[in-house]
Design a protein with these regions (language model features):
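Core dinuclear metal-dependent hydrolase active-site scaffold
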Residues: 1-4, 59-125, 203-213
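Di-metal (Zn2+ and/or Mg2+/Mn2+) metal-binding site signature of metallo-dependent hydrolases
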Residues: 2-29
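Histidine-centered active-site/metal-ligand motif
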Residues: 14-19, 79-81, 107, 147, ...
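Cap/insert and terminal regions of metallo-dependent hydrolase folds
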Residues: 9, 24, 36-38, 42-45, ...
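Helix-loop-beta element that forms the nucleotide-linked donor phosphate-binding surface
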Residues: 47-58
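Alpha-helix capping/helix-boundary segments
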Residues: 16-17, 43-44, 63
């Protein structure tokens, strides 16, 4: 689709199939010849093997990449990586901080709730938007270490002092026990109880992010 044109950077959080789909990346590469890939160590090597002409920037946790007024930082997440039988942990997973045009945006990637959220304000004292997963969270005894719940997503956003929380990672793949559209309903209800500002876009909706200062 035309909305996927003129992409400058493709951010891949980790190598799991629901986050790194080769046919989807192929379409993005074909439609965006100047697009660059920013990802964790090892993931770029895998993708560049599929698309040798793609410019790849790999990063370890806390490494930054600057391009004009844009700064990307690869950050820790509580998750894991694995694509085949014997490659578990070979590629680094993580989250992103995107700083551009006086707006700071956090993207959690896949993660469980952990201490890394509380550490973010030390490095990024003014986070405007927190994009964070809310789906694939049941049953909790199994999903809790690696997939954050709608409740913990709001707690994590508060931990990092984000102004606005935007949910993601729901309503696409049937990966867990909760109904596909349970997460946004729970998230919206809980955010209202806590008095936290959220943006809950429709799937596929384009939103324009505003500056706060």
């Amino acid at each position: 689709p035309s909305i996927f044109r003129d992409i400058d950077y493709l951010l891949i959080s980790h190598d799991h199939f629901d986050h790194l789909d080769k046919p989807s990346v192929a379409k993005l590469v074909a439609g965006n010849p100047r697009m660059k890939l920013f990802c964790g160590i090892g993931t770029g090597r895998l993708i560049q093997g599929w698309f040798p002409g793609l410019q790849v920037i790999e990063a370890a946790w806390y490494q930054q990449y600057a391009d004009g007024g844009l700064r990307l930082t690869f950050l820790p997440a509580q998750h894991w990586s694995k694509r085949g039988v014997r490659d578990g942990g070979e590629r680094l997973w993580g989250a992103f901080m995107i700083e551009a045009d006086h707006i700071t945006i956090y993207n959690s990637g896949d993660t469980g709730y952990a201490h890394h959220f509380r550490e973010l304000p030390e490095l990024f004292p003014h986070i405007d938007y927190c994009m964070i997963g809310i789906g694939a969270y049941k049953p909790r005894w199994f999903m809790k270490p690696n997939h954050i719940s709608p409740y913990d997503a709001l707690t994590a956003s508060a931990d990092m002092h984000a102004r606005v929380t935007i949910p993601m990672h729901y309503g696409t793949f049937d990966l867990s026990d909760e109904p596909l559209f349970d997460p946004p309903h729970v998230f919206q209800s809980e955010a209202k109880k806590r008095g936290q500002d959220i943006i809950l876009p429709e799937l596929g909706e384009i939103i324009k992010l505003k500056r706060f200062s």
